[in-house]
A protein has these predicted regions:
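Short catalytic/ligand-binding loop motif for oxyanion handling, primarily in non-cytosolic enzymes
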Residues: 31, 116-118
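All-alpha amphipathic helical-bundle segments outside canonical DNA-binding/catalytic cores
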Residues: 37, 166-168
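ATP-binding pocket architecture of kinase catalytic cores
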Residues: 1-87, 101-103
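Active-site activation/catalytic loop segments of kinase-like enzymes and analogous catalytic loops
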Residues: 122-165
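Catalytic-loop of the protein kinase fold
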Residues: 87-89, 94
Length: 168
């Protein structure tokens, strides 16, 4: 709020640059090599999510759907073969970034309690939820677009790929 579309675009570009730079940080040089388990990040995460869902169902907390059961069958067979490992934030989003007060420069990324070693694309996927979640004003589509200046998901992913040399 309170910024024009051009400024908003620059803010999103700065956020994407910080997101793209994070996996380049050498965890071993920072003595963080034991900060999380190396490798198999997606396999571990999908197993954990499915265990949590099963526990919620067993306790009556969840009303699991057929779609969730389909997802439970689909996930283990579609884990990406590229198993890069880097520092991931775990909650990388605009609200966890402190910007310079008068320019679109990231000063700090805050709220690190979910950080671990994992696959760099996990933070990218989380950061792109804005393009897929339904807001209070309804689903995002041509009739209800994101605020002016926020790049399309395709443009955001393309710029991330240019910055990192990898794509989703």
């Amino acid at each position: 709020p309170g910024v024009n579309p051009g400024e908003r675009h620059q803010i999103y570009d700065a956020m994407k640059q910080s997101l793209a730079d994070l996996p380049r940080v050498d965890s071993a040089a920072l003595d963080l090599s034991d900060f999380g388990r190396q490798g198999s990040y997606y396999a571990r995460q999908s197993t954990r999510w499915l265990e949590l869902q099963a526990a919620a169902e067993a306790s009556g907390v969840s009303d699991a759907t057929d779609a969730l059961a389909d997802l439970a069958r689909w996930l283990p067979q579609h884990i990406p073969p590229d198993d890069a490992t880097g520092i991931i934030h775990g909650d990388f989003r605009l609200e966890n970034i402190i910007f310079h007060p008068s320019e679109p420069t990231v000063l700090a990324v805050i709220d690190w309690e979910l950080a671990t070693l994992g696959h760099p694309l996990a933070d990218l996927a989380y950061n792109c939820l804005i393009y897929h979640l339904t807001g209070a004003d309804g689903p995002r589509n041509a009739a209800n677009p994101l605020a002016g200046g926020i790049p399309s998901e395709a443009a955001y992913l393309a710029r991330y790929g240019q910055r990192t040399g990898r794509g989703p």
